[in-house]
């Protein structure tokens, strides 16, 4: 059973799982969205269960008859006023999906976390066995809380497998590009990449999906893997975007501290602005202090190959233009 399959990472993960010969049951709130998302990748979406991850009984019914589960569904809210609801909804979802999967003896149980659960300022390199930290924003806090819960299941011996993707880019699922894809769209619109020590941590959605499919092997016990991808500093990022998009992109050495201040100010002003802005306090915290990612364990143990970020960015830009963005 898999949830979040109408989204970007979830849709590509479902395709990788199906391509590996597994049958997928889709947990969805609106089954009509399957046809406009993951089905566009050529995946059979006939087996689905209609449920919300916050509904314990309906989740359990969806889990019955399945051998394994991939859980990546989560409420994402950038408005600080929504933090409390996000924390409670996402924790309930983790308990209902991961917790009940453990009760039912499912193996493996894959939980898709985020590099933000491990992030802290001045961290040089991400690795899967770092202690839980999480950003200061609501989303980072939510990921950290669920991470603590999932690791508790691991400590008890449950076959929970946790992954930590970076900024996921690549071709869309229907019209879903994910948050990092929206970052590409914004950068191309502005023609400017600001920052001095800032960077993106780019991983291809197809490589993340391949990792999730590779984890669907029973009897391996609890495991954790980063899938951060490649750290691309501002000058290189501007060069790649400019070349693949055939446009002028400028790397502007704005002090990183100024970007963090701007993010905080725009968080406060956001509700009163007539437009959406990619600058948030949390986003600037991650962007200006982005670490490297040690993905060698998944490369060595699971045979995952992380493709050239230039190819990933090029595929993203091509697809954005194909949709008229």
Segments predicted by a language model, with ranges:
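NAD(P)H-binding glycine-rich loop region in Rossmannoid oxidoreductase-like domains
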Residues: 42, 46-89
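NAD(P)-dependent short-chain dehydrogenase/reductase
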Residues: 160-162, 166-200
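Conserved beta-loop-beta element that borders a ligand/cofactor-binding pocket
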Residues: 113, 148-171
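N-terminal Rossmann NAD(P)H-binding glycine-rich loop of SDR-like oxidoreductase domains
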Residues: 1-22
